Design a protein with these regions (language model features):
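Extended low-complexity, intrinsically disordered and solenoidal helical-scaffold regions
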Residues: 2-216
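N-terminal accessory nucleic-acid engagement/regulatory domains that precede
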Residues: 127-135, 140, 145, 149-482
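Conserved, well-folded catalytic cores of nucleic-acid-processing
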Residues: 473-480, 539, 561-564, 606, ...
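Conserved adenine-nucleotide phosphate-binding loops and their immediately adjacent elements
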Residues: 484-497
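Pre-Walker A adenine-sensing motif
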Residues: 497-515
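ASCE P-loop NTPase helicase motor core
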Residues: 510-676
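Conserved RecA-like ASCE P-loop NTPase motor core of nucleic-acid helicases/translocases
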Residues: 519-562, 615, 671-715, 719, ...
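Core RecA-like ATPase module of SF1/SF2 helicases and allied nucleic-acid translocases
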Residues: 527, 566-569, 639, 651-654, ...
Length: 903
């Protein structure tokens, strides 16, 4: 046996022993296996390289087996080994980006399992070499129910399907491999390739095909069913696919490089490039980074049958900038890695001007920060995922960016303003890295994006400035109240014209502006925060009032709950977008925990108000971007400005109220209480049985057996009405729907508006929906909107809308949203979508796939959506893991540091 085989088998033996001994501890096992993988891949690459020199490796000198660089170079030049190249790159990038804790190792090992199976299969086929013989014992899937589900799908995948390739194009949003009997299959999440499609319009399909996810694709899709829990669940099978970048995306990319072209999908150059990308599994950036000889070969192949070259004229220009590392190269790297029409349009200068600092590309100057420091800056209107960046941009010499990114994410994602030096153990010379980062910033950005420190705690300067400015402004307006305020409220109440039947709310109203001109009202879910807003609005009935909230559903809720005159209601985004300065006597902001620091400082700078009411719950889902001001205000603003509502009104169910309190306080006996009161249930068919007409199923994820898509398919199959297909989605009369964000029907149909399909008519190029919506409108409301009012009752209205399909729709840059269905089927919805809504019955599904994503705020928000019945579907193991991991972030370190800094 040659030395190379000895080395490979020695590594394999080590992996085998680890799996054999440590199956019950996936984190520890993953850590040990990951330590072996780089060496494993590199020696496999050498074996293939040496074999390519001579089919018989027995006569090859031993020193050849040490040529790791030659081995890696060989596999990079052969499309068969693209998976091996990708695996090696991932191992390298993971080592530089992750601390190899057991938890991180476990995540990575699950991601890499697919590649290990490919190695096993290739070495057996090519050399009859048996490796990874017990890899099937690695505990990939810890849920037996999921295994049964996927086995039934695999039975369908193994059948031969013949279906036509779609004319429609799709973007692949997520590819999740799953494994049955050492074979690899994929669960694909995809959506229409349309600039206006909502991120919530996701479809799930299954395939044996390893589909490239960088670009738009065409799919051959077949409808089928599998039997789950005695019910036939509709599924989609992808039997074939092809790369099909939208021609308008190539046109836009070319414009950025000052090459005006008009590509058609019928062009030979286009067709051969799409075919080559699929066959070689090289994305456009991979092609651009090939050595000159290989690049010219690809170019010659793709353009062989073309009378005129269009695409490669653009790619030649692009390659020259990227290979020579000229300014603009990182923007081009990312855009060529992910051709996406919407993203590219956002980068262009609105007047079509050149950016001199980025090699005269036709992009806006706002692209410069990303080009210079891509790991800690965003493109215009787009925040790239870290793994996409790691794939297309080298990290060498960018450690300062990775450190800054970690500090930034700790604030934006974890809500921590200050990050301790102890959290940066994987970085060396932190002080020097921060100096480098700060000096590389554009001088005008150093005060906002720069990193500062308080002792051994680091922070983003702009984040700290925002929260300090907010708190100082609130402290300033809390110094004095309204003279004779309490007496005036007492007098108003004594007239009997307005009744407040809650003693606590009456006392708050009497004192809220006695000593302060700002009132912060905190309250748990269902304690009547909206009612309190209504009381205050009615007392100030003659004064001009502006009521703001972050979302359309929250604004709509205020409109329903507030009956006072002289009120104007707006979303925060709409208010800030308006250029006119708006004055008011009373400014009220609802759901303050969802308002980011940056938005709040803008509101305080723009608004001209005399009194301010801030309302929210710090235990519900927080701001998407960094927003900790409302939590910190509770300990930094005068106590005379702080009020708390404690008595719940959403429900009178004592066990349910006790549960809310226990989750809110994260009490020690939470698991026992959930069990004793039958709130915890194992996942079974009962989740699909409707217990109440006003019922919702809440999930955190869209894919998987118990994801939103599958639950909707299950429950829709119970609907006896005829199914009407539009694209890959089925609709039925009687389906509940939830509207997405759409400018086409705004403000009548808004994000999160609930409705029900009352009629469907399908034509060749048009589908017409009649939707009953839970709001009453009149004919004047829909003037100038593409809506028809069919009927209206005391509590609802039925509106008619049309969605169209045009030939070669995705070829062109179609800005129209009349091709997009503006709602999603909503038997089940996401927990985030449910915020601000309430139901008689809530069923919450938490699987082991998403247990790490369940935070204290997410769990609390989910369980407080119900007024009567609650069931949480999870395994005992998942329940234990979630309860043990959720924590209440008290932000004590942030509070302590800020107290010292505030005036």
């Amino acid at each position: 046996m040659k030395k190379i085989d000895v080395v490979i088998l020695d590594i394999d033996k080590n992996i085998y022993k680890n799996i054999d001994k440590s199956q019950d501890d996936r984190g520890y096992l993953s850590q040990n296996i990951l330590a072996q993988l780089r060496n494993f891949i590199e020696h496999i690459s050498i074996k293939y390289y040496v074999h390519s020199i001579s089919g018989d490796i027995s006569g090859i000198p031993e020193e050849k087996f040490n040529e790791i660089n030659q081995g890696l170079k060989f596999i990079k030049g052969n499309s068969k080994f693209h998976f091996l190249v990708k695996f090696h790159q991932m191992i390298q990038k993971s080592a530089s980006h992750y601390t190899m804790s057991e938890e991180n190792s476990e995540r990575l090992m699950l991601k890499y399992y697919e590649y290990l199976l490919k190695i096993k299969k290739n070495l057996k086929t090519d050399f009859d070499l048996d490796v990874l013989t017990n890899i099937d014992k690695f505990p990939v899937n810890l849920d037996n129910q999921l295994s049964d589900y996927y086995k039934k799908i695999v039975d369908k995948l193994e059948l031969t399907y013949v279906s036509e390739m779609s004319e429609d194009r799709y973007y692949i949003q997520k590819t999740k491999p799953f494994f049955i009997d050492n074979e690899i299959y994929y669960e694909i999440t995809f959506r229409e390739a349309n600039d206006k499609t909502s991120k919530f319009d996701r479809n799930i399909a299954f395939t044996k095909q390893d589909i490239l996810s960088n670009y738009a694709v065409k799919l051959s899709i077949k409808h089928d069913t599998v039997n789950i829990h005695g019910k036939y669940m509709p599924i989609l099978i992808i039997s074939d696919w092809e790369v099909s970048i939208r021609p308008c995306e190539i046109d836009f990319f070319s414009e950025i490089l000052n090459n005006s072209i008009k590509i058609q999908s019928s062009h030979n150059e286009y067709k051969r490039l799409m075919s080559f990308i699929k066959k070689s599994k090289l994305n456009v950036l991979d092609i651009l980074l090939l050595d000159i000889s290989s690049y010219e070969k690809v170019k010659a192949y793709v353009t062989a049958k073309s009378q005129k070259i269009y695409i490669f004229k653009t790619l030649d220009k692009c390659r020259e900038i990227i290979i020579n590392n000229r300014p603009g190269c990182n923007v081009l790297r990312y855009l060529s890695y992910h051709f996406n029409n919407k993203i590219m349009k956002l980068q262009k200068d609105r007047y079509g001007n050149y950016c001199e600092r980025l090699s005269n590309l036709r992009v806006a100057y706002g692209c410069i920060p990303f080009d210079e420091m891509p790991f800690v800056s965003s493109l215009i209107g787009h925040n790239p995922k870290i793994y996409d960046l790691l794939w297309c941009i080298e990290t060498n010499g960018r450690e300062h960016e990775l450190l800054a990114r970690k500090i930034q994410i700790n604030s934006q994602t974890n809500g921590k303003l200050y990050t301790s030096v102890d959290e940066h153990e994987s970085f060396e010379d932190i002080h020097l890295l921060i100096e480098k980062y700060n000096s590389n910033l554009y001088w005008k950005h150093r005060e906002t994006r720069g990193i500062g420190n308080v002792g051994k705690n680091y922070y983003i300067k702009g984040f700290e400035d925002d929260v300090i400015n907010i708190l100082e402004k609130l402290k300033e307006i809390s110094k004095e109240g309204i003279d004779n305020y309490a007496n005036s409220v007492e007098s108003w109440l004594n007239t009997g014209s307005y009744i407040i039947d809650c003693k606590d709310k009456k006392e708050i109203l009497k004192t809220m502006f006695s000593n302060s001109k700002v009132s912060l009202i905190y309250g748990a879910a269902g304690t009547g925060k909206s009612t309190m807003i209504n009381h205050a609005s009615n007392f100030f009935g003659l004064q001009k009032k502006l009521l703001l909230a972050n979302t359309n559903p929250a604004v709509d809720n205020l409109k329903r709950k507030v009956s006072a005159p002289n009120c104007e209601f707006k979303t925060i985004a709409k208010y800030l977008y308006s250029k006119e300065k708006q004055d008011c006597d009373l400014l009220i902001i609802d759901e303050c925990s969802t308002v980011s620091n940056s938005d709040m400082i803008k509101i305080l700078s723009k608004a001209d108000f005399k009194l301010l009411i801030l309302v929210g719950d710090i235990y519900q889902i927080e701001s998407i971007t960094f927003g900790n001001w409302f939590k910190l205000a509770k300990t930094n603003v005068s106590r005379t400005s702080l009020f708390e509502l404690t008595e719940p009104y959403r429900t009178k169910d004592k066990p349910l109220l006790n549960l809310w309190t226990k989750v809110r306080k994260n009490e020690d006996d939470l698991i026992e209480y959930l069990t004793a009161n039958n709130y915890s249930v194992r996942l079974d068919e009962s989740v699909f049985l409707t217990d109440d007409l006003d019922e919702i199923i809440l999930c955190l994820n869209y894919d998987g057996l118990y994801g939103i898509n599958n639950i909707n398919c299950f429950l829709q199959s119970n609907n006896p009405n005829k199914s009407v297909n539009w694209g890959v989605v089925s609709y039925k009369i009687g389906d509940p729907v939830l509207f997405n964000e759409t400018s086409r029907f705004s403000p009548v149909l808004f994000n999160n508006l609930k409705g029900k399909i009352s009629n469907i008519e399908k034509l060749d190029t048009e589908i017409i929906f009649d939707i009953e919506i839970e709001t009453v409108i009149n004919e004047m409301d829909i003037v100038d909107l593409d809506l028809e009012l069919i009927s209206s009752t005391k509590n609802s209205s039925i509106v008619r809308l049309s969605v169209y399909k045009y030939p070669n729709m995705s070829d062109n840059d179609n800005d129209s949203d009349d091709t997009v269905v503006p709602f999603q089927i909503a038997y089940a919805i996401s927990i985030h979508k449910a915020q601000g809504l309430e139901f008689n019955s809530v069923k919450l599904i938490i699987t082991d796939e998403i247990d790490e994503l369940i935070t204290h705020n997410i769990l609390y928000t989910a369980i407080t959506r119900t007024k009567k019945n609650l069931k949480i579907y999870w395994t005992p193991e998942t329940e234990k893991k979630v309860i043990e991991h959720i924590r209440i972030d008290e932000s004590r370190k942030d509070e302590s540091i800020l107290k010292r800094k505030l005036k």
